[in-house]
Amino acid sequence: MFANSGVASTAASFSSFPTVRKPISERNFKSPAIEKAIATFKQKVKNEELGWLFGNCFPNTLDTTVFYSEKDGRPDTYVITGDIDAMWLRDSSAQVYPYLDFMSEDKNLQRLIIGVINKQTSFILKDPYANAFYDDDTKYTRWNSDHTEMKPGIHERKYELDSLCYPIRLAYGYWKKTNDASPFDAQWKKAIETVLRVCKEQQRKDGNGPYSFRRTSEWAIDAVPMGGVGYKVNPVGLICSTFRPSDDATIFPFLVPSNFFAVASLRQASEMVQKITKDNVLADELLALSKEVYNALQTYAVVNHPKFGKIYAFEIDGFGSAYLSDDANVPNLLALPYLGGVDSDDAIYANTRRFVWSEYNPYFFKGSYFEGIGGHHIGTDMIWPMSLIMKALTAQDDEELQRCIQMLQKTHAGTGFMHESFHKDDPKKFTRSWFAWANTLFGELLWKTFNDWNTNHLINQCK
């Protein structure tokens, strides 16, 4: 289960920090703007270990996971997760999103990100119910025997609502940074129409829709009950998600964090469609669905907890059943403000945040030094660095932010990188040594903290 480096993971254990980043000649993509940021961070941050980690983690997506080409004269970028040679709509969006701020200094980086947008558009049009794809339609997938409509070029066909939201977030972020509408052509508009269709199908007002999924597996997290469509829901306006961002099956199909994400993404898509394509009918439909989902969340997703008061449930069925928990994968309840789902001063979110970071969340784990959220995917006592990163990115005060960074600094187990998960009492027991999303997200956190004059001093106070 564990990838074990066998190296202690405290700052005191290192007399120096070895070179673990790929040599320049072996890097998949080179960005002068990112190299400049790394040099600036290392020069001005006194904490040598954090400088080393930033230099390794922030460029990891570019160094190791992106494959740029041009198809029919248009940028086309395939982005693998790291140790899995497949492109997840979710991961690929999150992996390159932190680079948006650097496009103005690096036009090649901008073209790379246009390529990601174009590739995601083509994948959504291929199958909006799939979560992960190959660049080669002839490549064999181990999931070919899944009982669902597998097509050539699909790695896995788990329907996850957030997989349709992340490409919108990336597209919107790109558009806002550049005011460039060139990637948002007729094909992109068709992809947005497809997203809208799937969201409406998965409101399940007129039956279960066309998607179902069953897998022959010993893992319960892959099991979708009721003939592969999931447990019954009351069609109250929310959107079903058969799987979570962790690729684990939902218990109750209305996955609350993903619905909040959809509220933000549908609103963003509406704005883009209205201003770029001038299709007011489609823009109005997108906005109307966003409002419908938001209102349903406020009506059905809020529960009264005996200790924390009003909080958002993790999953619900619309009949009154609710699952109170949180998972480390994003979108989760912890990350709602980060993704634009709620305002950071939302009172119910504040209560929810305290709940998910407590022993009342069955997947919150606390060791002698480390604490954080894990999930069903890896199991008991395994903390995901992503949860610590997201707690820091939504931090309420300096002490909380600094504590998260200090814990993250001590999780790398000598590898110089973040991992998928680590044991609450022993970071040397970790999963996935090459997980680019966590690396880039950690880099985003450090760069954001470093560049904010309100928090800049905290970087140099970390030990």
Give the positions of each predicted feature.
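Well-ordered alpha-helical scaffold segments within catalytic/enzyme domains
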Residues: 33-46, 94-107, 166-181, 260-279, ...
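Hydrophobic alpha-helical transmembrane segments of multi-pass integral membrane proteins
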Residues: 40-45, 51-55, 220-225, 301, ...
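Extended, well-ordered alpha-helical scaffold segments
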Residues: 53, 107-123, 180-200, 269, ...
